[in-house]
Amino acid sequence: MSITIWILLIIVALFGGLVGGIFIARKQIEKEIGEHPRLTPDAIREMMSQMGQKPSEAKVQQTYRNIVKHAKTAIKTKK
């Protein structure tokens, strides 16, 4: 084969690997954020305290569940 064909094959392979890697990384990040949101119950409790609310455990857990539920539905509807 000529050198031009080899160069084209290498460029196509690199481009395909780049595109495939981006999609795989994106899926993994979406899955990780869906399973483990960045806001934890402790962070929610702290935010409620800073806003002047007295954070009861039931309210903190309810807010946390709503955040997790919203994140999962956002990922599902985006597909």
From Swiss-Prot:
Assigned keywords, A-Z: Membrane, Transmembrane, Transmembrane helix
Family indicated by similarity: Belongs to the UPF0154 family.
Pfam families: UPF0154
Organism: Streptococcus agalactiae serotype V (strain ATCC BAA-611 / 2603 V/R)
GO cellular component: plasma membrane
Ranges that cross the membrane: 5-25
Record-given protein name: UPF0154 protein SAG1601
InterPro entries hit by this protein: UPF0154 (IPR005359)
Localization annotation: Membrane
Keyword Transmembrane helix: yes
Topology within the bilayer: Single-pass membrane protein
